[in-house]
Structures are given as C-alpha cells and as structure tokens.
C-alpha cells in the first residue's frame, strides 16, 4: 500500500489534518506543542482509492533534549521511505526557519512533496499575505486548507491520488485482511515496551528513550514472522489514575491504551524485573483479564538482575502469587535491549492465540464433568447437568445447572480448573463462564 507522510514543524495542525483525512480521532490533538511523539498511521479511503497515511512528530530545527532529538530521527528516517510527503506549514503565520530547514532536507531527499498551507480559513488573506513567500520553499503551488473547518480537503485528496497514480502505485481498495494476530504491548512507563516492540520488528519504528512517558500515541506496525502476519501495537505506559491530571494529553493516552487492549487478540504485559511486581502491574493485568484478552507476561530487563541464573524459581513464584488471576499466561524472561528470548515471546504469543481461538467438543467437556463430579462435593442443592463451549476469543462455556444462585466463585474456579486439567489447558487464554437454569 502506498505510504503518505504528514510532516512539519510542531503545532501546524498535522494531527488535526490526519484525523480529518482518516475520518476518525486517532492522533491526539492539543494546543500543547509537540503532543505527537510517535508516528500514528491509518488507511485513507476515497472514491475507491486507498493509501496509508502517517502522522509524524513535529520536527524541531535544533532539538534541545533527547526526546526531541529521537523524534526528529524517527521522522527523518520515515521520510526517506515514504512514497509521498505532505509538508504542512502554517497558512496564517507563514514560514519560519524551522520550515526552511525541513524544506531543505525534503529537497535533498528527492521525495515527492505536496506543500500544504493549513489554517488558511481566510483564503483572500492567505492569497495576499502568505502564499507569495511559500514559493521560496521550492515545492510549487501550495494547497491552502483548513483541517479544523474541512476547507479544501477534497482538493488535497485529489492531488494526493493524482501524484501516487503518476508513480504507478496501486491504489485500488482491497478487502481487509483479518487473519493477522493483533498484539498489544502494555505496561507501566519505562519498563521497556518500546524496546521490546522494536526488537520484535527489528527496526526503529517506535520512539525509544530512558525517560518515562516517551510514548503517547499507540504505534502499530505489521510484520511477517515465519509466514504469519502480526499487527503489533506499542502503547503508552499506564500510570495510576490518581497520578494523571484530568484533561491532559496523558489522560487521553490512557484511554487509548484501553482501546488498544480492546482491539487486541493477545496482550503482552511487560514487567520490570529490577522492580518486581507492583500494584500498578497488578491493575494492568487485571484490566487485561477483565477485558477477556489472551496474555503473555514478560519479565524484561532480566540482564540487570543480580544472580539471575539462580532466581528463575523465585520470580516464577512471585508471578504465581501476585498475578494469580492470570497464572495461565506463559511467563518469559527477556532483555529486549540485548535481544534475549525475543523468539520465545513470539512463540508464547502464538501459543496464547491458539488457545484463544480453540474450540473443544462438547463430548470432552461432559466426559470430564462426569468423571470429576463422581468424587467432588458440590454445595448442597446444586446440580451441574452438562456444559458446552459457545464461543472463542475468549473461550466461553455454558453450563446448565438447576440453580444459578448457588453457583458462587469457588464453583467457577472449580469449573475453570476442570476444563484446563481434563479438557484443554488453554494456556495464555482466559476462560469465560455462563450459566443457564435447567430442570
């Protein structure tokens, strides 16, 4: 699929333009400068033509900190790989030194570029005061738009399609491929999610730095491993709600993480092995379990743990005790920074997904039920007649009982254990239960 990149200095309205073109609110939009830190992508469909649109972080001329420097590096690397660039400038303020520096880089890269003057609500004022100086950037006729007010976006789309077709790129809409395993990578800030994400993808796609809170937007990318397609989502670190100010960019990012979990098949929960398992780790794992997603637990930064060769059992016990409610999850010890056990993470994802999509025959369920009930005492008056699996993603079982009110948590634990021990282990997947009254 053709790739179109939106670039420009901070706060010229790139994310607003992105959201309007993809027709959904995916990139975070705020008045705060430099809100977009990671590239965000989606598909644009327009009159039967499709292309991938990528919203990049604002390019600072002279980045003053490590985050800004990393943002610039990621964006400039993506420019070199793009089919077309939308160079966005401020149609009210005109050009700045930052615009001129980026224009110089774009010209040297020889990438096809469309100059977009955003915030040009007043076209007469734009034509008179701003447009003449834009020609000095060297990209020909600028296209004035107002993303916020939906002005001239059709003209922009027509120009994009024309440019891409002139390059001989196939823009025909194709049926969406839904056989990919969707994987969300979640965890507290600075546990190494982005480093793990990049180790799996083996390229600098997500922004990685040692400063907590670097990733704000979910970043997703496709990868084929041994012929299998995955879509990985690297999500912003979840912090405790009490530590997140309302109406902040970070608050929006936390909502986006929950949304990423909702859309995932398998969630990789990343823990910092140097810090053990915290209350917030437990909250995140609980969120994944309640949403009914398959899960893999990763102790990252294993290379920094002292005497690690003798401590596998200790950390496994810690996992079983503190994350007992997802103890069905595969547990992997990694150093994403050094590339340790990345293949095992992939294997665990495959195992969890296989469990998540497995359906077992009713005969196996009821055979196990009869066998175990023969030596099990149920609460007085409770009878379990038979059961069957009614769904996958997650595996969901319906049991027919004489009294739903008598089915308490111990009986639910008993039935889940019965299924895992006697029918199918469902390693990596939660098991949901439903009950129906029957005589």
Curated annotation (Swiss-Prot):
Task: Respond yes or no to whether keyword Cell membrane is given for this record.
Answer: no
Residue stretches in coiled coil: none
Q: Where is the EngA-type G domain?
A: 2-168, 181-357
Please give the biological process terms from Gene Ontology that the record holds: ribosome biogenesis
- Annotated residues that bind GTP 1 are located at 8-15, 55-59, 118-121
Keywords attached to this Swiss-Prot or TrEMBL record, sorted alphabetically, are:
GTP-binding, Nucleotide-binding, Repeat, Ribosome biogenesis
Which Gene3D superfamilies did the record assign?
3.30.300.20, P-loop containing nucleotide triphosphate hydrolases (3.40.50.300)
Residue span(s) of domain KH-like: 358-439
Q: Does the keyword Nucleotide-binding apply?
A: yes
Instruction: State the InterPro entries in the record.
Output: G_ENGA (IPR031166), GTP-bd (IPR006073), GTPase_Der (IPR016484), KH_dom-like (IPR032859), KH_dom-like_a/b (IPR015946), P-loop_NTPase (IPR027417), Small_GTP-bd (IPR005225)
Record's CDD domains? Answer: EngA1, EngA2
Residues annotated for GTP 2 binding in this entry = 190-194, 300-303, 336-337
> Which terms in the Gene Ontology molecular function aspect does this entry carry?
GTP binding; ribosome binding
Q: What is the effect of changing residue 300 to D?
A: Slight increase of GTPase activity
Assembly mode: Associates with the 50S ribosomal subunit.
Free-text note regarding domains: Each G (guanine nucleotide-binding) domain has activity on its own; domain 1 is twice as active as domain 2. The G domains do not interact, instead each contacts the C-terminal KH-like domain which lies between them.
- Role noted for this protein: GTPase that plays an essential role in the late steps of ribosome biogenesis. Has GTPase activity but no ATPase activity. GTP, GDP, and dGTP but not GMP, ATP, CTP, and UTP compete for GTP binding.
Question: So what family is this one in?
Answer: Belongs to the TRAFAC class TrmE-Era-EngA-EngB-Septin-like GTPase superfamily. EngA (Der) GTPase family.
* Official protein name in the record: GTPase Der
Q: Which organism is the protein's source?
A: Thermotoga maritima (strain ATCC 43589 / DSM 3109 / JCM 10099 / NBRC 100826 / MSB8)
